[in-house]
Amino acid sequence: MKKQYVTVGTETISSNIFRKILRPLNNYTFKPTGGLWAAEFNKYIISDWYEYMITKDSYLQTLKSFKVAAIFTLKDDAKILTIDSCNQIKELAKKYPSYHHILGLCEPLTTKNKIFDFEELSREYDGVYINYYGINFSREIETFKNWSINTLLLFNIDCIEKYQSINIMPQNPYDSE
């Protein structure tokens, strides 16, 4: 069976909701804007991201709908770059250097916060899969420390094979039925 991913907060995946990937505006989180953000689907907890939003981040709960989601699979020829090592981040920073975040400098630049240009990367790949747990375990590079979980970020939704809408309304423990 193909690996399934889930994006929370929308029940449809279309060009109408998709925004072009843009470089990080600052170096506070090093996160780009746009794209389609997702996590691996888990039939018991929906995803690590859903679990994180429900249990850890009440601010996100005010911004995002937790009632709907879309589960999807990727086409076999989808070009997804898996980032799972600190050396790989260093190499990407050399190959796709980014200087735009300096305009919104929030933290001093160090050898621990390497950044690369997501817009340039999107010209070559359909998306990136960030192995957050593998990268952050070493603490050598802190570029992805604020990503919270393993994350799939799609730059191009044409790499999606199919998707299915799901209702993920949490059960109210006070309901009698």
For each of these PLM feature ranges, what is it?
Residues 1-24, 55-177:
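Active-site and NAD+-binding cores of ADP-ribose-processing enzymes
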Residues 23-65:
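Extended catalytic/binding region for NAD+/ADP-ribose chemistry, centered on the ART fold
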